[in-house]
UniProtKB/Swiss-Prot annotation:
Its EC number is 2.5.1.75. It catalyses: adenosine(37) in tRNA + dimethylallyl diphosphate = N(6)-dimethylallyladenosine(37) in tRNA + diphosphate. ATP binds at G36, P37, T38, G39, S40, G41, K42, T43. It is an enzyme of class 2 (transferase). The keyword Transferase applies. Substrate binds at T38, G39, S40, G41, K42, T43. Signal peptide: none annotated. It comes from Chlamydia trachomatis serovar L2 (strain ATCC VR-902B / DSM 19102 / 434/Bu). The gene is miaA. This is tRNA dimethylallyltransferase. Keywords: ATP-binding, Magnesium, Nucleotide-binding, Transferase, tRNA processing. Coiled coil: none annotated. Residues 61-64 are annotated as: Interaction with substrate tRNA. GO terms for molecular function: ATP binding; tRNA dimethylallyltransferase activity. Pfam families: IPPT (PF01715).
Length: 339
């Protein structure tokens, strides 16, 4: 299967009958974006969707790039990856850094590779900042100011990183909403840019001169479950991760040096259990730590929903009463329709 039309015929979806339109659409280099909060079912839907559109999946998850971070990121299984090719999973060691710029260039390269084989790239994930980077181009922030950075690092030691995060919320609430109050490196870098340039990170950082992704025609869908269903999914998800051996995974990552990477070690599902293990795994703190894990995950989903709803590109898809197959078919049908 090498074209959208052959996929459409096989599945019974409406396909453009006008050859000129089909030819034009082919050269638009269409990319599918499938976003949603943690626990919304993105991965499951994407695995159903990929065969319908003859697609391959590009992970848009800031933590799934790391080797060994499998259970806590709900990484797609090796068996599923054999059935549906995936990109941007396990691309670096936990001690290596990986940021939005890295993601942009990896994602563009993956899109070019997939399209060169007449397949459809499907970007799937919940990291809003990475979607933004793909759509807007790589950030082009000012050069580092190491003297100012050292001053901010000392401030963080004296005042606490939470105080610096509160300052960032006042100065640039848009950017602050994309990171956590524990992400020391990003908070310090953001304040460094603001103090050095007088400009907000959210407005300054995206003045990019090169954006290869603009050559793609992007069509996006946002999975938006009912909040009660999402909360139920998160409770089940957290329990399942613990049953599958999340604590053992965290222990192995500690041995692999995850603490050397502030982003990876502060990821939800890891930072809570790293702290628990550092304290000697006291039994009386297990339930408290588990509740922190659940609460932090739920708070993050609220940030994700707020982030994605700002973008008109994403068409909201509510799963109420729909099976995974229903949702995948709906997206595929919309993809193949003329318009």
């Amino acid at each position: 299967m090498s074209s959208s039309s052959s996929s459409g015929a096989a599945t019974g979806f409406a396909v453009c009958s006008d050859p000129q339109k089909s030819f034009s659409k082919m050269f638009k280099r269409t990319v599918i974006l499938l976003a949603g909060p943690t626990g919304s079912g993105k991965t499951a839907v994407s695995l159903k969707l990929a065969p319908l559109v003859d697609g391959e999946i590009i992970s848009v998850d800031s933590m799934q790039v790391y080797q060994g971070m499998d259970i806590g990121t709900a990484k797609v299984s090796l068996a599923d990856r054999k059935e549906v090719p995936h990109h941007l999973i396990d691309v670096c060691h936990v001690q290596e850094s990986f940021n939005a710029v890295d993601f942009y260039y990896h994602a563009v390269q993956a899109c070019q590779d997939i399209l060169s084989r007449n397949k459809v790239p499907i970007l799937v994930g919940g990291t809003g900042f990475y979607f933004h980077t793909f759509l807007s181009g790589p950030p082009s922030g000012p050069s580092p100011d190491f003297v100012l950075r050292e001053q901010l690092t000392l401030e963080a030691q004296e005042r606490g990183i939470s105080a610096l995060y509160q300052e960032l919320e006042l100065l640039d609430p848009v950017y602050a909403a994309t990171i956590t109050k524990h992400d020391k490196n990003k908070i310090i870098r953001a304040l460094e840019i603001i103090r050095k340039t007088g400009s907000k990170v959210s407005s300054y950082a995206w003045q990019s001169t090169v954006n290869e992704s603009k050559e793609y025609h992007c069509r996006g869908w946002l999975l938006s479950p009912d909040p009660e269903l999402l909360r139920h999914n998160i409770l089940e998800r957290c329990d399942q991760m613990l049953e599958e051996g999340l604590l053992d995974e965290v222990q192995a990552l500690l041995a692999a040096g995850i603490k050397g990477n502030s982003s990876a070690s502060r990821a939800i599902g890891y930072r809570e259990w790293i702290e628990f293990l550092d304290l000697g795994s006291p039994p009386d703190l297990f339930e408290i730590t588990k509740q922190k894990f659940i609460t932090n995950t739920w708070r993050y989903t609220k940030k994700q929903r707020t982030w994605f709803k700002r973008y008109s590109l994403f068409r909201e898809l509510r799963p109420m009463g729909m099976t995974l197959d229903d949702m995948a078919k709906k997206i595929a049908q919309d993809y193949f329709l003329c318009g």
